[in-house]
Amino acid sequence: MKTVFFTGFPGFLGSELLPRILKRSPEATALCLVQPKFAPLARERARPLGDRVRIVEGDIAAPLDVPIGDVSEVFHLAAIYDLSVSRERGMKINVEGTRHVLDFAERCRSLQRFHYVSTCYVSGRYEGVFREDDLDVGQRFNNFYEETKFLAEVEVRNRTGLPATIYRPSVVVGDSTTGATQKFDGPYYVIQWILRQPRVAVLPVVGRPRRYRFNVVPRDFIIDAIDHLSARSDSLRKCYQLADPDPLTVDETLEVIARASHRRVIRIPLSRSVAKFAIDHVPGVYRLLRIPAGAVDYFVHPTLYDTANTQLDLPLRVPRFADYAARLVEFAAAHPEISASAMA
């Protein structure tokens, strides 16, 4: 009986992906490394899977002391998903943590596959088309989250003896069918700002919104994609950018959100630098907008993501943002208690 080793459960993606992996392999069991503070939630979410899931308390920040057994497949999703993370913490979790999982995988004698969830934003602020085989192209990074995820992917690629596959999601939002999510970030900052306003809403807009694109994919697409691609033998040693190949411009994205929110939006243009300075240094601005300065960078993002491998190997298409945005808005309006923080 094969064992799947899994990090990132019961997180935003892991909670949905683990049951899918086990459904695909009825004979498999899962060994989930979970931080002690999340262990009760992990056990609750694993309950429908019965004795097929074993929760082991631990942390990727330290060398892994867990039984290797007959682990044949590793899914590494755990990371710090925080644009404001310090470099020290990002290095400890995203880079050293990935190194510890890689070390564990190399000790697994039955290992057949290693699946690593990276991010499109290892591109940093690269100008132009960033391809699935690109990594170090001399890019500058917006923040330590991007930099440490980049360095973590370098670690994975440097382990040339491991049978690895890399998945790079773009900005992930809630389920395209239900709108459900565990965190409000990315476009949700705009959704929440607009929902707090009257029918005619004022929205600060940075840069040139008709030039830049905002790449959004729903969680269910990411889960479907990883589930399918991880089962393919020919996905071995490939990288897949799980992104919209034809994303809306920022301006189009804002208009879709406005319509879904039943608002008419008056745009107030601001430069990127002025917007970030005001949020960080002008008293009351952050409390009013509730948009972190680091999020501003993604509304003037200069990178386009090539998805050639994904389009070739995945018989699924990314749902169009305009087709499900109303569900995201409805869920956000009904759940004001959800925050922007994501589970590591």
Residue positions per predicted region:
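Active-site Tyr-X1-5-Lys
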Residues: 140-170, 175
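Amphipathic terminal alpha-helices
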Residues: 25-28, 305-344
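A conserved pocket-lining segment of Rossmann-fold NAD(P)-dependent short-chain dehydrogenase/reductase
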Residues: 86, 178, 187-221, 225-229
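Mid/C-terminal beta-alpha module of Rossmann-like enzyme folds, strongest
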Residues: 228-291, 327-344
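N-terminal Rossmann NAD(P)H-binding glycine-rich loop of SDR-like oxidoreductase domains
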Residues: 2-25
